[in-house]
Amino acid sequence: MQAALRRTIRTAGVALGALALAGTVLTMTPGARAWMWAALFGPPDLGAVDFRTLERPGTPNTWLVCPKGHCPGAVADAAPPVFAVAAPVLFAAVREAARADPLTQEVAADAAAGTLRFVARTPLMHYPDTVSVEVLEAGAERSTLALYSRSQIGRSDFGANGKRAERWLARLTQALPVAED
């Protein structure tokens, strides 16, 4: 009886050790984390956004940059600058601003419609966030954008979406001339 109990305890210990090792590998390896989040929560890309009909959730894990009147169903966190460049130039600059973040991948782009979509991951846990951008004409050789960054996982993002949006906007204002009114 004691030998059977010892075998059971030893087997349980080995199983718990294997589970702990697997958990460590899954949480410490970036590729494994991405796989784990996809397995638990589905594909990381949350899909396209129509800024004209956008309604934000009640959770604090989104950030919206939108010109006045373009997002009538949502309150923006910030207004974007108007750039003294044509929309295709701003479109290319948005791509470059996003690519400067090492954990960001472009998942969709339509130059004719002026839309881009990215999956950006947080540095430590690699939580996926979807960033949708629409580049808008704002007059002759002038353009602006709408940007919506939202988390797939969790209720709070500890400000990650807002920091990302501000970082991208800072890159754009450094790279492009801002229009004077």
PLM-predicted stretches and their roles:
Residues 2-12, 22-181:
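Ser/Thr-rich, low-complexity intrinsically disordered terminal regions
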